[in-house]
Amino acid sequence: MKKILFLVLSASLLYSCADVSGALFAGGDGTYDFKNVHLDPKYQVDESKIHLLDLLSGEEDTIYALYVGDFAQIATDTIIVFLHGNTPSMDSYWQTAGLFSNLVEKHHYGFIMYDYRGFGWSTGRSTGAASMAADYDAVLSFLQAQGLTSDRMVVVANSLGSLPAGPAAAGGSSIPVQKLIMEVPQSTSNVIMQNATGLSLPASMITSYKFDLGQNMEDYAGELLWMHGTEDAVAPLETAEAAMQKHQGTYYQEAIYEGAGHGLRWDIGDEEWSKVVLDFIRH
């Protein structure tokens, strides 16, 4: 009887999770209230440099992106392209935007982040590798039209952001990735699925979203910084390590922090986090 009940529950779970967005992704509403009042005073920005963009992704979806900086800066300065983690919208990363916008000095670097389909105000649903690649491409097309080149682009992927960042770094980016920061990356769909369902089922049983971050890193020829905590229960260190250490590119750096969890920057502090990131950008 227990076995039959388990099979029934499993079948129900498989059916309900056939849509990847329901199983893997935590997309939701966003307010997009990007103002200094919500920032730590030391990370406040020039509010005239806050730009909310709507970009066409694929044939019919619209994704929303936040650019902080002067548009003219894109053609001359280093731009941070931030791929956020598994939260309802990029609202959760406004403080991160402020931090990046104040590295070195206020607006030394341009900064852009965006919501994947189904996150925040972005339309549609994130359904797999193709939809996430299309969203990334939409942002890169905008930056490329503004004059961004590969030698001035730094891609920063937080947690779930490793899903689009990996294939992009491995050759799927219209602006080739030369510098990549992987912060607490999700490295296998199995781990993400287990976190979402609480069951140790292979992701292939539930979703067609398969990704191989290890292969992506093996194929990535540029510079890589990997940052992780030893106590990360969301993106386990061991699985991330196996993927990251396949990198054989021009430069590899890892920063592993004892006792830190998935909220790495909060655990180690902004000063240490910023130092490691800035040193890598300047390398």
Language model region names:
Residues 104-123:
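Conserved alpha/beta-hydrolase
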Residues 220-221, 225-232:
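Short beta-strand/loop motif that positions the catalytic acidic residue
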Residues 126-147:
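Alpha/beta-hydrolase active-site loop
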Residues 16-56, 68:
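An N-terminal hydrophobic leader/cap segment in hydrolases
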Residues 88-100, 125:
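The serine-hydrolase catalytic nucleophile loop
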Residues 95-96, 213, 222, 236-246:
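Short alpha-helix in the alpha/beta-hydrolase fold that links the catalytic acid
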Residues 164-216:
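Hydrolase active-site cap/lid region
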Residues 249-283:
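C-terminal catalytic histidine-bearing segment of alpha/beta-hydrolase fold enzymes
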